[in-house]
Amino acid sequence: MYATEAGGFAPEVEAELRKMEACDLMIWQFPLWWFGLPGILKGWADRVFAMGRTYGGERFYENGVFKGKRALLSLTTGGPEAVYQRGGRNGDIHAILRPIQRGILRFTGWDVLKPNIVYAPVRISDEQRQASLNAWAERLRGIEKERPVEVGEY
């Protein structure tokens, strides 16, 4: 809060804040790591999503600082899709992503788009990998037409 009030963010944090404020669409590309964000991305979020600047007071969810901006998660997993289903060994992937999609992104006002998930890319064939990349490229070409998804409640 002090950095927000005093304008005292470290230059690299201020630069990241300005990037978020300027963008229309933010994409986080990462491997799912211990059912969450990799440490470096979690650390980035902890530093950059600063109280007073990106949320606070009545500025959250539909009244959030980033209202009207869109965000999506693009991630890879270590296991196949079957283990990330409700009742699967690792649980429902959407429940796993909820703390990120709702607790960080939607909380600060972002409209969250459907995540792009590639399951176990190290275990799929070159043809499957290429098909996944092609589908992602095609999706990105039409991303401006996508509607936000409901990220669920706790």
Give short role names for the model-derived ranges.
Residues 7-101:
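Helix-loop-strand module that forms the ligand-binding subsite of alpha/beta enzymes
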